[in-house]
Amino acid sequence: MPKFEKLTLPNEGEIITFNQGKPNVPNNPIVPFIRGDGTGVDIWPATQIVLDSAIKKSYGDERKINWFKVYAGDEACELYGTYNYLPQDTIEAIKHFGVAIKGPLTTPIGGGIRSLNVALRQIFDLYSCVRPCKYYSGTPSPHKNPQNLDVIVYRENTEDIYMGIEWEAEDNNCLELINHLNNVVIPKSENLKNRSIPDGSGIGIKPVSKSGSQRHIRKAIEHAKRLSGDKRHVTLVHKGNIMKYTEGAFRDWGYELAVNEFREDCITERESWILDNIQKNPEITIENNARKIEPGFDKLTNNKKAFICEEIKEVIASISNSHGDGKWRELILVDDRIADSIFQQIQTRPQEYSILATLNLNGDYVSDAAAAIVGGLGMAPGANIGDNAAIFEATHGTAPKHAGLNKINPGSVILSGVMMLEYFGWDEAANLITNGLSKAIEQKKVTYDLARLMEPKVEPLSCSSFAEEIISNF
């Protein structure tokens, strides 16, 4: 047990342990919580009472969360001193107890940590950010049919541009790097000749690794295995058409993982086309199958034609018995889409998607865009998951002007708590909360952010009253 400088442990409770990335959760886990800055003072108490009430209703005295208050953000500075936004106590507590939940955190002032959220993800190697985007009936939305969108965004959390490896324009290190790239590296790269980085540029590095990509996509596929029907579907979202060696590699490594590690569980989109063509026409030739899966096949070079035909032969030889005759329809479909097109498709063809596996930057964009469709960040939960820790969090900001007014929507943190309960395997309590929240919204008993958008106008509930309304629906 670590020694804490200024923290008080709960009187009882056990530690959550991890085995091969999966949590072993006792009936009385100790769970650190960070209240959060700004409106955290309102939304965390509302969340805690909802979670505790659902657990009590579902399991009686058999299960209980023992809450352990830890500090980050402005509240940490008040206790630990100026600029101490992320105390060592908090780091040690989360490391020891494994799972934590938090409200929104401020952006630190001064040098050092740029983002507390990013710092926590990097410290604990929380490599997958999980953002469900689901519509709750009655929630105001700018879209005609928001109920058609039900996706889970798996955003890689530790690599890509968000690693923060960058240099300011005119910084000496930046100038040295540009000089080296322009005069040494670029001239040696056949595909980059006649290009150069302009003077006065800032430089950011976009690292994307095979190991980082595959461990993240593995989490997405493992999640899909728990789903049923058309929801057993993972889409690799990328800009590989432009960034071939980073975003394109992410796509390729995802397919490689699916067919090598999850062969019995997965079918790629292209493989499904090949097998479907055979099922519809058992006499189809290799060449005609190729014409169906590859537009413009007859205009390709002979080498490319031969490559595609070999691909089809390999699919038939390797999986026609195990995946053919329609059996592939019961498996996880793995496909890919260009990032900019997915922004259109989650609006125009939302039913076609389930789990979106993305790199860091794309995932940030897509998850917020999807949240807007189903009602905004006030109802958008999030989790950051690694192999030895998990942190569940509000996805919105601190909204300091509303702090202490008991008016803000606690839905984001409450639903993040639901994700935590599901992570524990406490599905009965999780379902109780989602059903209670759904009923509250359907009955138009909501906080001001939703009430002001409803027609006809309704009288808003306070933050705490909204929590009580959810509990009353248990």
Question: Where are these predicted regions, by residue range?
Answer:
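Glycine-rich phosphate/nucleotide-binding loop
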Residues: 2-11, 76-78, 328-329, 343-445
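N-terminal phosphate-binding or glycine-rich loops at protein starts, especially the Walker A/P-loop
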Residues: 7-65
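Structural/interface elements that position substrates and couple domains in central-metabolism enzymes
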Residues: 12, 32, 53-54, 58-59, ...
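Glycine-rich phosphate/diphosphate-binding loop of Rossmann-like nucleotide-binding domains
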Residues: 26-27, 32-34, 38-48, 181-337
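Buried hydrophobic positions in well-ordered alpha/beta secondary-structure cores of metabolic enzymes
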Residues: 37-40, 98, 154, 220, ...
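Generic secondary-structure signature for well-ordered alpha-helical cores
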Residues: 52, 56, 60, 96-99, ...
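N-terminal glycine-rich phosphate/adenylate-binding segment common to multiple enzyme folds
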Residues: 75-191, 202-203, 360-365
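Glycine-rich phosphate-binding loop
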Residues: 93-106, 266, 281-388
